[in-house]
């Protein structure tokens, strides 16, 4: 494995830590190769050996084990023209209880002309009284393809924890060739039991997920995806899923009343979409570790 040296930092509990990742790949001699890599504690990047038949992989690691109030993380991924890559996170991101300050995560995904990027973060677990503000900005070039998503779990259901107070502000902004084509915002703040339990809102769900596919195949895959979801029995009392197309983007929403089944179904759908896009119809090994 290859990784860049990390930069030292001094932790200040009142201010949190500031970590960042800057990662770009370029096409050289018909292969996607690392162009530049910068990271600072508590973040680092590992470039593992590429599995057969797969695009080059990058793994983002948060060595602190989770986010506390005041932490700020900044991730920027750049896929230069015609590159093929997959970037994922090593493990679930935990957002711990805060005494008042917000944890902030800024993500920028640049997918230049003819490139294909998969951004596969593992689930975010929001602890009771955790506070998270996350923004994902996407910049698509001509004929760019992106498969990306996020999954959020509301509390540690395996420990019987209920999410009662806190903040979740999770937004997406997608630009295609300079024009904003999709904006999305989920905001829960203060007393979280009302929106989490209300039948017209999250109806007691333990987690939710969003998947986004951009590319010329996106709209054409809507009906095949719906058919696959039905045949695979993805919907049931523990999981609800819906898919649609917005300005040429395929958007899939999930609600789960069982966190394990939500993650399992989400991964199966991701694998199916990979197969439709010419990649192996499987999840990276790290997903199941």
From Swiss-Prot:
List the Gene Ontology MF annotations in alphabetical order: nickel cation binding
Record flagged with keyword Ligase: no
Q: Which domain of life is it from?
A: Bacteria
Q: Which residue stretches, if any, does this entry annotate as coiled coil?
A: none
Against InterPro entries, the record matches this protein to: UreD
- Kindly state one GO CC term assigned in the UniProt record: cytoplasm
Keywords (A to Z) from UniProt: Chaperone, Cytoplasm, Nickel insertion
Subcellular location(s): the record lists: Cytoplasm
Major place of residence: cytoplasm
On subunit structure and binding partners, the annotation says: UreD, UreF and UreG form a complex that acts as a GTP-hydrolysis-dependent molecular chaperone, activating the urease apoprotein by helping to assemble the nickel containing metallocenter of UreC. The UreE protein probably delivers the nickel.
Described by its record, this protein's role is as follows: Required for maturation of urease via the functional incorporation of the urease nickel metallocenter.
Q: Family assignment?
A: Belongs to the UreD family.
Q: What HAMAP family does the entry give? A: UreD
- Listed name of the protein: Urease accessory protein UreD
Q: Which organism is it from?
A: Magnetococcus marinus (strain ATCC BAA-1437 / JCM 17883 / MC-1)
């Amino acid at each position: 494995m290859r990784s860049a040296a990390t930069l030292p930092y001094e932790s200040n509990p009142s201010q949190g830590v500031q970590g960042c990742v800057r990662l770009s790949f370029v096409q050289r001699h018909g292969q996607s190769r690392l162009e530049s890599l910068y990271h600072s504690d508590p973040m680092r990047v590992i470039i593992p050996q590429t599995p057969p038949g797969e695009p080059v992989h990058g793994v983002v690691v948060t060595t602190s084990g989770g986010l506390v109030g005041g932490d700020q993380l900044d991730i920027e991924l750049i896929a230069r023209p015609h590159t093929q890559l997959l970037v994922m996170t090593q493990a679930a991101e935990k957002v711990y209880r805060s005494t008042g300050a917000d944890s902030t995560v800024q993500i920028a995904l640049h997918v230049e002309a003819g490139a294909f990027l998969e951004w596969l973060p593992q689930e975010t677990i929001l602890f009771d009284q955790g506070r998270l503000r996350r923004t994902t900005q996407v910049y698509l070039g001509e004929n760019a393809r992106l498969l990306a998503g996020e999954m959020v779990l509301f509390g540690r259901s395996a420990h019987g924890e209920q999410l009662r107070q806190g903040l979740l502000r999770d937004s997406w902004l997608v630009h295609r060739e300079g024009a904003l084509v999709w904006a999305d915002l989920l905001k829960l703040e203060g007393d979280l039991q009302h929106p989490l339990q209300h039948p017209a809102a999250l109806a007691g769900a333990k987690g939710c997920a969003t998947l986004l596919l951009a590319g010329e195949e996106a709209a054409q895959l809507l009906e095949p995806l719906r058919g696959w979801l039905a045949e695979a029995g993805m919907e049931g009392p523990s999981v609800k899923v819906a898919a649609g197309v917005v300005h040429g983007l395929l958007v899939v929403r999930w609600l789960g009343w069982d966190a394990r089944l939500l993650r399992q179904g989400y991964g199966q759908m991701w694998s199916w979409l990979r197969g439709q896009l010419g990649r192996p119809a499987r999840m990276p090994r790290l997903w199941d570790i």
